Amino acid sequence: VELTPRQQGVLALQAVLPILHLGLEWYRGFHEVIIIPEPVTRRQEVQDEFGLVSEFEEENAGESWPQGPLVLAWSELQQDGDWDGFNLVIHELAHKLDMLGGDADGAPPLPRGMDPQQWTRALQGAFDEMNDQLTREEVTEIDPYAASHAAEFFAVCSESFFTDPLRLRAVYPAVYDQFARFYGQDPAARYPATRLLAGDPGAQG
């Protein structure tokens, strides 16, 4: 996908938002962002508690690996930019921050002065609460994909922190407080919303 200078700039602005007060060194370990036209479909295998293996196809709009590039689907990026709790760039870069601590597990290295126990207590409590809601077949305020894994909970809540901060603060105030300390920002204070990425039809696949 070939992007215009404006589109490149807008994506760069979104990418720098999470590390605005952390510093560029928090993006160490990767040096490339690959933009593909559409999400990638991969065949996955999952083993249940009885040892039975089943296959399914999973569509990935973005992917990130330790020391590897960031892969983002342009068709999905064009839908981002509103303050609606969804942002692919922030989601995948949150995984990159998470991986600085080793495996992606929702426990990135914390800035000096933060209490790891408070971090774990806040995120684990909210993660368990969301899973309990889904068990009761209730509608969640945050994207239920967050309940699939601790790493996804961190990434999805990071999306919400920056693009729907009032909702995250209302639903999971302890998580919002920890994120405000981690990212060194209070996005709820900069409401009202502003468009981060206006869909520009000028891109070429």
Language model region names:
Residues 1-42:
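Extended cationic-aromatic binding surfaces that line active-site or macromolecule-binding grooves
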Residues 13-21, 38-83, 100-205:
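Metalloprotease/metallohydrolase-associated module, dominated by Zn2+-dependent proteases
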Residues 29-35, 71, 97-99:
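A structural signal for short, well-ordered beta-strand segments and their strand-loop junctions
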Residues 81-98:
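Short alpha-helix carrying the canonical HExxH Zn2+-binding catalytic motif
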